[in-house]
Amino acid sequence: MTREVVVVSGVRTAIGTFGGSLKDVAPAELGALVVREALARAQVSGDDVGHVVFGNVIQTEPRDMYLGRVAAVNGGVTINAPALTVNRLCGSGLQAIVSAAQTILLGDTDVAIGGGAESMSRAPYLAPAARWGARMGDAGLVDMMLGALHDPFHRIHMGVTAENVAKEYDISRAQQDEAALESHRRASAAIKAGYFKDQIVPVVSKGRKGDVTFDTDEHVRHDATIDDMTKLRPVFVKENGTVTAGNASGLNDAAAAVVMMERAEAERRGLKPLARLVSYGHAGVDPKAMGIGPVPATKIALERAGLQVSDLDVIEANEAFAAQACAVTKALGLDPAKVNPNGSGISLGHPIGATGALITVKALHELNRVQGRYALVTMCIGGGQGIAAIFERI
């Protein structure tokens, strides 16, 4: 009998901006919070979970080496359930969901959790010479946050890869700025309409005047204008460059998690799933143009699902940069109205290891809100990869 994976709950935190409301909250704590809430919403006991997989990229403290396990146990999952932390860079959160789903498909368990947690605000500085080499004189530090934003093969910033994509796919500065502005418009409208309320679990922390509750995405510029965008100078290529701080994604902090179940088990429990996982796909591309990774990954996922682009109702294609987001939409022939209807990485933010899980939660809630059938979740990955997954509302 063929096994099917359904998502029975999905939650996320609000997304904090760099050095913002979540800068003092460890990613393991954010992970535990979303695990606990996802279990509660799914009406599933932590004793029933057979596997947990979490995405994380930048380790900020010793606990992060075991982030998946810490998030699981502190989130209420039985200590008997194994847990795994995965790093597929920007695709880590979605990879965690795929990997957790695979444990169900393989028959290892009937209940699994996939998610991601990241705190770019807490990224450490590495002192490579501190243990053995710093006997005399000055010693340098390596910014691990910036390290995650550089291509490991060509030692170039991801912004340069976006410039390469812009040139190859003829994406102008004006197109990028307009796309960035539209991202802020959509995110602002979604927040004001309350579209995210049901998917966000508040983060409560101690402040000098008592508890402080963080429950609203804070990276969005609600008053952004096209003039704001056009005034910014290119950051990565000074002469004839097009990528700016305004049309690139943010540096952010957040977490998200989904509870998945074998379909027959969900039916036995009388649960109403958000969606079923239809297919997924991975692909490798030239690292110098990593932003185009969603194109081949999406084609693989569509082929496995037996679907066409026209069948998709909601598309979450992460905006690492407006240049690559526009190129992906162009290359796949996507309907811009269906792509990131409530904003994406530029406006809401891109907490790298968590983003894949975040946009999955966003996609599933939006799919149910608009009563669509199919949703695509896809993203580019530093180092030259792409990942995609397709879900069906049932």
Curated annotation (Swiss-Prot):
Record-listed E.C. numbers: 2.3.1.16, 2.3.1.9
UniProt KW keywords: Acyltransferase, Transferase
Class of enzymatic activity (EC top level): transferase
Gene deletion effect: Mutants are impaired in their ability to produce PHBV when grown on propionate.
UniProt GO MF annotations: acetyl-CoA C-acetyltransferase activity
Domain of life: Bacteria
Matching InterPro entries: Thiolase (IPR002155), Thiolase-like (IPR016039), Thiolase-like_BktB (IPR053528), Thiolase_acyl_enz_int_AS (IPR020615), Thiolase_AS (IPR020610), Thiolase_C (IPR020617), Thiolase_N (IPR020616)
SUPFAM superfamilies assigned to the protein according to its UniProt record, in alphabetical order: Thiolase-like (SSF53901)
Active site: 90, 350, 380
Reaction(s) catalysed (UniProt annotation): an acyl-CoA + acetyl-CoA = a 3-oxoacyl-CoA + CoA; 2 acetyl-CoA = acetoacetyl-CoA + CoA
Family: Belongs to the thiolase-like superfamily. Thiolase family.
Entry-linked NCBIfam families: AcCoA-C-Actrans, bketothiol_BktB, PRK09051.1
Function: Required for efficient production of poly(beta-hydroxybutyrate-co-beta-hydroxyvalerate) (PHBV). Catalyzes the condensation of acetyl-CoA and propionyl-CoA to form beta-ketovaleryl-CoA, and the condensation of two acetyl-CoA molecules to form acetoacetyl-CoA.
Name this protein carries in UniProt: Beta-ketothiolase BktB
